[in-house]
Design a protein with these regions (language model features):
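N-terminal glycine-rich phosphate/pyrophosphate-binding loop and immediately adjacent elements
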Residues: 3-143
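Active-site/ligand-binding neighborhood in enzyme catalytic cores
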Residues: 129-249, 437-445
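A glycine-rich dinucleotide-binding beta-alpha-beta segment and adjacent secondary-structure elements
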Residues: 192-207, 413-472
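Mid-domain catalytic core of redox enzymes
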Residues: 230, 258-368
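A conserved beta-strand/loop element that lines the FAD pocket in flavoprotein oxidoreductases
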Residues: 246-259
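C-terminal segments that line or cap access tunnels to active or ligand-binding sites in enzymes
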Residues: 319-426
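A conserved FAD-binding loop/helix module that cradles the flavin
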Residues: 467-489
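Active-site-proximal substrate-binding core of FAD-dependent oxidoreductases
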Residues: 491-502
């Protein structure tokens, strides 16, 4: 049983995972969350007496021996989930690509969608899948990048000895972008494939084929088919089960408790934390909020580009959608490449319209008969919305919402079935969660490979968790970063205790 105390700022998946691991080892953990719910991007909020997901709706890594499933098993957490064999369709200007798990059906889909270059596309994807397998193998070794201490290696040395060809292949492709791999198959100018990859990558790694690092992108482009899961009661259940486990282990979670100040006491070698419901000193701090509390306390303060999101939440009549959704296992997603008929979308946003249909639920999480929930997000630059006057902001927001619904209408009749819709911009995110940026940093070769962001900050005994962990971004990487931070604290505080005795 450790007497060490740790404060976790932010109850996202990364913060909750680190708190659960530390609490299991006997550390006294206190989680401070600004919102009324836990889970962060895997959480939820209430609008018009309906429960909407904050961000993610589909989970990855929950297959048997999957990364997230393994972490949960280590924490003695059972999380029921149902696999989705056809989780998404990507709507391109000249066709559609269905993302399906079955390998034979997927190859058929590639041949049909990219018929003129089907041979090259199939070979490209086979290589991508192999690289993805290699990346997953290294990630399963629990190596934490950048490697600064011996324990950051995890079991990578053993993995390298057992899989020399795999590691050599990763070394060969380490500095590749996705476009570089496309060039090997003379596909860099093949626009239909480029449109598919850009749509998938912007959502997953926050950039396009020209800049996306191949190694993390290979996993992002294959992860839907590796295993997509619907968690019973929604993605918010992941945060709930982690929070419950922390409490069972003696940890404390304080919601609606935003942090006001964070100061390091050099003489005591402790952090003084002041929030609405907590004023105390801690041996270590983990920042999962994405908010800066001073130099070196968050990656938000660095000169690094991040996207914001334009978001539409809606409730639809299920009856009018029954024909289109009757063969779909919900949640079901569409990525829609916008047409030229949507000038406001093209001026203010970037990439595809990402829309997910799910069962509508009330604040208690109970299904609402006759309704379908629709959540929509588009990438947008952070600064443009604050430059508008109040009237311009309102007008452009309404126009982008209108065009977004029209883009979805090309695929499924939402307008005539619309019961309620509400839009938000990065300014809305800032108002409710304290930050405009979402989704992490673009996974360029620099950000992902040559200068990855560590869970250790430049400040003593302060750690940063979130979507920056390799292979990132997303819930899976957030959970991994939480594990890495907990591992670092257990090792570092033990070393600090020995130093204090001398």
């Amino acid at each position: 049983m450790s007497s060490k105390t740790v404060c976790i700022i932010g109850a996202g998946v990364g913060g909750l995972t680190s708190a659960a691991y530390l609490a299991k080892e006997g550390y006294k953990v206190t989680v401070l969350e600004k919102a009324t719910t836990v889970g962060g991007s895997a959480g939820w909020y209430i609008r018009k007496r309906r429960k909407f997901p904050t961000g993610a709706t589909i989970a990855f890594g929950l297959e048997e021996k999957g990364l997230l499933r393994t972490l949960l098993n280590e924490l003695d957490i059972d999380l029921p989930a149902e696999e989705l064999l056809h989780p998404m369709d990507v709507i391109l200007p000249e066709g559609k690509v269905s993302i399906v798990k079955n390998p034979a059906l997927w190859e058929h889909e590639l041949k049909e969608a990219f018929h003129p270059r089907s041979g090259d596309v199939v070979r490209f994807w086979a290589t991508l899948q192999q690289i993805s397998d290699d990346v997953l193998g290294v990630t399963e070794s629990r190596v934490s990048l950048p490697i600064r201490k011996r324990y950051d290696l995890g079991t990578l040395p053993r993995h390298a000895v057992r899989n020399p060809k795999s590691v050599a292949r990763l070394a060969r492709y380490a500095l590749y972008t996705v476009e570089d791999l496309m060039k090997k198959f003379h596909l860099e100018s093949y626009e239909p494939l480029r449109q598919l990859l850009d749509a998938q990558l912007l959502d997953a790694v926050q950039t396009d084929v020209s800049k996306a690092a191949l190694l993390p992108s290979s996993l992002a482009l294959t992860i839907y088919r590796r295993g997509s899961f619907f968690i019973e009661n929604g993605m918010g259940q992941l945060g709930k089960v982690l929070a419950n486990r922390i409490k069972d282990l003696g940890g404390e979670i304080l919601k609606v408790s935003p942090v006001d100040s964070l100061l390091y006491e050099e003489t005591r070698k402790q952090w003084s934390v002041t929030s609405r419901k907590c004023t105390s000193s801690f041996d270590a701090v983990i920042n999962n909020s994405g908010i800066s509390f001073g130099e070196g306390t968050s990656y938000e303060s660095e000169d690094e580009f991040s996207w914001g999101a334009f978001r539409v939440d809606a409730i639809l009549s299920a009856e009018g959608l029954s024909r289109q959704l009757k063969e779909r296992r919900l949640p079901f997603a569409y990525q829609i490449v916008p047409s030229l008929d949507s000038p406001s979308i093209r001026e203010t946003t970037h990439g595809p319209v990402y829309v997910t249909f799910n069962h509508a639920v009330n604040p208690k999480g109970e299904p609402v008969e006759g309704e379908v929930m629709m959540t929509v997000s588009l990438h947008t630059e952070l600064g443009i919305w604050s430059r508008y006057t109040e009237d311009e902001y309102k007008r452009i927001k309404e126009q982008v919402t209108k065009e977004t619904l029209s883009e979805i209408e090309r695929v499924i009749p939402v307008k005539e079935n619309l019961l309620f819709a509400e839009a938000g911009t990065p300014l809305t995110y800032e108002r409710y969660i304290g930050k405009r940026a979402v989704g992490g940093f673009p996974l360029t070769v620099r950000n992902a490979i040559t200068k990855p962001k560590s869970v250790r900050s430049s400040q003593p005994q302060l750690y940063i968790v979130g979507e920056q962990a390799f292979p990132g971004p997303g819930t899976l990487s957030s959970a991994l970063s939480g594990y890495y931070a907990a591992r670092s604290i257990m090792k570092d505080l033990k070393r600090l205790s020995k130093w204090k005795r001398y």
